[in-house]
C-alpha cells in the first residue's frame, strides 16, 4: 500500500512522516515517534488507556487513523510537562495517589486534562461522568476523582492557570 505524507504537530513539535493509510494513531505515536506514554489496552475504544488530545478533543488513538491527524495538533501525556515541571493534572495524580498499576494512567491524565479545559470547576458527580470513558481495574476511582479535584483547584491558582 502506498504511504501518505502527513504533517502533524505533536506536543508542540512539527512532524512530517510517511505512513500507511491504515496505520492507527497509537502505533504512529509509539512506533514512529517513540512516544510510548499512551497504552494499547482493548483496541476497541472501550478502556481509554490510549487517550490523546487532538485539536481540543479527547480521542481514543487505538481506533483513530494517523492520516486523520494530517494538519492537526496532537497532545500526548508526554506533553503534559513543561521543562520538567508537572502539569497540574499529573501533579494531582501524584499527590492524591490516583494510580496503582499505572496502565490506565496516561489515558486518565489526558481525559482529565481535556475535561478540566471544558469544565474548570467541576463537582464530584461531573468528574465521575466526565471520566466515564476511561476504565481502571485497580483504584476504585475515588483517588482518581480526588486527583482531578486537586488539579482543578491547582489550575485556579494564578501561578498555575496557564500550566
Swiss-Prot record:
Keywords noted in UniProt: 2Fe-2S, Iron, Iron-sulfur, Metal-binding, Oxidoreductase
SUPFAM superfamilies hit by this protein: 2Fe-2S ferredoxin-like, CO dehydrogenase ISP C-domain like
Entry binding sites for [2Fe-2S] cluster 1: 42, 47, 50, 62
Gene Ontology MF, one: metal ion binding
Pfam families: Fer2, Fer2_2
Keyword Protein biosynthesis attributed: no
Reactions the enzyme catalyzes: CO + a quinone + H2O = a quinol + CO2
Uppermost EC category: oxidoreductase
Residues annotated for [2Fe-2S] cluster 2 binding in this entry: 101, 104, 136, 138
The EC number(s) this enzyme carries: 1.2.5.3
UniProt cofactor note: Binds 2 [2Fe-2S] clusters.
InterPro entries: 2Fe-2S-bd, 2Fe-2S-bd_dom_sf, 2Fe-2S_ferredoxin-like_sf, 2Fe-2S_ferredoxin-type, Beta-grasp_dom_sf, Diverse_Oxidoreductases
Cofactor(s) needed: [2Fe-2S] cluster
Occurrences of domain 2Fe-2S ferredoxin-type (ranges): 4-80
Subunit structure: Dimer of heterotrimers. Each heterotrimer consists of a large, a medium and a small subunit.
Function summary: Catalyzes the oxidation of carbon monoxide to carbon dioxide.
Name the UniProt record assigns to this protein: Carbon monoxide dehydrogenase small chain
Origin organism lineage: Bacteria, Pseudomonadati, Pseudomonadota, Betaproteobacteria, Burkholderiales
Amino acid at each position: 500500500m502506498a504511504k501518505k505524507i502527513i504533517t502533524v504537530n505533536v506536543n508542540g513539535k512539527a512532524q512530517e512522516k510517511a505512513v500507511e493509510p491504515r496505520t492507527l494513531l497509537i502505533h504512529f505515536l509509539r512506533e514512529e515517534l517513540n512516544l510510548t506514554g499512551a497504552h494499547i489496552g482493548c483496541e476497541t475504544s472501550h478502556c481509554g488507556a490510549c487517550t490523546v488530545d487532538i485539536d481540543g478533543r479527547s480521542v481514543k488513538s487505538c481506533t483513530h487513523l494517523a492520516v486523520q491527524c494530517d494538519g492537526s495538533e496532537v497532545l500526548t501525556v508526554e506533553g503534559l510537562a513543561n521543562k520538567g515541571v508537572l502539569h497540574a493534572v499529573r501533579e494531582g495524580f501524584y499527590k492524591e495517589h490516583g494510580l496503582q498499576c499505572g496502565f490506565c494512567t496516561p489515558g486518565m491524565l489526558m481525559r482529565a486534562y481535556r475535561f478540566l479545559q471544558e469544565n474548570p470547576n467541576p463537582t464530584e458527580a461531573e468528574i465521575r461522568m466526565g471520566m466515564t470513558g476511561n476504565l481502571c481495574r485497580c483504584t476504585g476511582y475515588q483517588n482518581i476523582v480526588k486527583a482531578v479535584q486537586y488539579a482543578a483547584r491547582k489550575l485556579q491558582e494564578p501561578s498555575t492557570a496557564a500550566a
